[in-house]
Amino acid sequence: MRLPEKFEDRMKKMLGDEYDDFIKSMDETPIFTGIRINTSKVGAKDAVIKEFGELQNVPWCSDGFYANKSKISGNHPYHLAGLFYFQEPSAMSTVSALNIESDDYVLDLCAAPGGKATQAGAFIGKNGLLVANEIVKNRANILSDNIDRFGLTNAVVTNETPQKLAEKYVHFFDKIIVDAPCSGEGMFRKEPQAVDEWSVEHTVSCGVRQKHILDCAMKMLKGGGYIVYSTCTFAPEENEQVCAYMLENYNVELVEPNNLDMLSKGRGEWSNSKCDMSKTRRIFPHKNNGEGHFVALFHSLDNYESEVNKPKKTSMTDAEKVYRQFEKEFLNTELDGEFCLFGEQLYLKPKCIDVDKIKVVRNGLNLGIYRKNRFEPSYALCLTLKKEDFKNTVDFECDSEELKKYLMGNTVECDKKGWSAVTVNGYPIGWGKASNGILKNHFPKYLRLKR
């Protein structure tokens, strides 16, 4: 790989005797991909591991595995059912560093495409909250789709600037994830265009931007809360030097990140300060099976309280009444929460957050479409529930022709009546509506297989 001369010179100074091993690793093309199991779906880990054989565990993520690129694809039924997520193994370290509790309010400030948001969301229970933000609209839509497929309920997707969120949610979140936009040096092996875009000036400008994002994050953090900061670059200007800025400007401390003892420590001499960086962590491709990455965990030493008012409870609407009738007829479970209608889309929104004057892509769980006093359930609702939550299910084996026909958008034979969940080996993958021995296909058109 042809690397920028100034990049090589800097890495020589940083790594010393390790430089030759590092530069050799940059010429190696990884044959593995990373997958992370969706632990919120009961038994998913066993099912996926059985399907793909012996998988090597990612050392810093108990639910992450290395998989052979040639043996797994995004069209696999288990991926479409939200049982696993493709994610660079190094990127799994960011959320692993946090100890997320089920009732935490968590913000992922730079969340697309959704790897870290779905990883965090798997820990969050009915009393917790995930807000996943993405400033670019089309990327926010992709983020929302991935959260839908993962079956997360108490998750809101926003499309805002960090500044706008900071004005709205003052000292609101227990934990904040800042996987900051960066120069991408750690991804040179997988994304050659990042090499062409690299310059010393770019790394410096990224550092300025990252500090601004962290300024906004600090305004939203509760007293005693945690911010995990990460990048996929080797540049000290974006890593240790950004951490030094935090330590020098805020009442925070660096703490040992969870689950990352096996990784290299950051260096204080790279921070251009007297700050101790031994509690930060780095991933280097010549030392670990993963691309370049940096992680730091900050703990707030302040004790201020949240300044955010909770939203008022709304009264039952006609849309909710129609949904409750659908629920009574076709489900064995009753969802708890508050309902809101965005156009024709009916959402079950988290009770704890006010999104007034915020650009929202997903205001909680999308239940389905309410139109002319009728309700049509969503793909997101199906993937949130478990097989036992449905009154009607049509189960197919993972490698069956019937499942392939369904995923291509075709009708299949069925002895049920009305709305039915199609499941793959017991895991919901989409809806169908049965009548006269035929299951009409309601698998999302944008996900349907071509052949």
Residue ranges and their predicted role:
Residues N133-H171:
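S-adenosyl-L-methionine
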Residues F173, Y226-Y229, T233-L348:
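Class I S-adenosyl-L-methionine
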Residues N138, K175-C216, C232-E240, N258-D261, ...:
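Mobile active-site "lid"/loop adjacent to the S-adenosyl-L-methionine
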Residues T33-M92:
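Conserved AdoMet
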Residues I124-G125, L221-G223:
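Helix-to-beta-strand junctions that scaffold the AdoMet/dcAdoMet cofactor pocket
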Residues D103-A112:
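Conserved class I S-adenosyl-L-methionine
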Residues P113-K126:
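Conserved SAM-binding loop of SAM-dependent methyltransferases across substrates and taxa
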Residues M1-K50, E291-F294, L301-R451:
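Polybasic, low-complexity RNA-engagement segments
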